[in-house]
């Protein structure tokens, strides 16, 4: 039961509890349960291979909800391009999408980088209360760019 991988997962669970990060706690708990119940290796491989896409899909659904509920309409889209923040947001979204595509390709060529990415992501989640998400990164880049624009003015 206490294999190296289980100890590693328990360490991440402890870090999640210390940092009070529910996302990390839930993710680690799910993986531990999959491991404890000896879920088939094919299921684990499928989750590993497709999990990122599932996560992006869920985030995309959450982003589209304000459009579906009428909170955001065409007027808001048009108005967004009347400000520097709107254009920077568009550019940040495009840049992050391109970077993500390149990152996925790079991970396929050099899978060893995945270990560092996983560890770095978990460190950022625990130490800096970061969030492991893609579109949120685009918003963060847009925020940083807007801070730069405000500083230059």
UniProtKB/Swiss-Prot annotation:
Keywords: Cell membrane, Membrane, Transmembrane, Transmembrane helix. It is a multi-pass membrane protein. It is found in: Cell membrane. It comes from the Bacteria. The chain crosses the membrane at residues 6-26, 54-74, 80-100, 117-137. GO terms for cellular component: plasma membrane. It holds the Pfam family DUF441. Its main location: membrane. HAMAP family: UPF0756 (MF_01874). Belongs to the UPF0756 family. This is UPF0756 membrane protein lwe1581. It comes from Listeria welshimeri serovar 6b (strain ATCC 35897 / DSM 20650 / CCUG 15529 / CIP 8149 / NCTC 11857 / SLCC 5334 / V8).
């Amino acid at each position: 039961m206490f294999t190296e991988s289980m100890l590693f997962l328990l360490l991440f669970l402890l870090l999640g509890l210390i940092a009070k990060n529910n996302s990390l706690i839930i993710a680690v708990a799910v993986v531990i349960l999959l491991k404890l119940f000896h879920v088939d290796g094919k299921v684990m491989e499928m989750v590993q291979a497709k999990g990122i896409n599932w996560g992006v899909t869920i985030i995309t659904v959450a982003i589209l909800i304000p459009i579906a509920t009428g909170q955001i309409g065409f007027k808001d889209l048009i108005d967004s391009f009347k400000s520097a923040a709107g254009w920077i947001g568009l550019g940040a979204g495009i840049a992050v999408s391109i970077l993500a595509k390149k990152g996925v390709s790079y991970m396929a060529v050099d899978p060893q980088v995945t270990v560092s990415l996983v560890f770095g992501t978990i460190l950022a989640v625990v130490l800096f209360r970061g969030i492991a998400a893609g579109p949120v990164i685009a918003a963060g880049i847009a925020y940083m760019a807007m801070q730069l624009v405000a500083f230059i003015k």
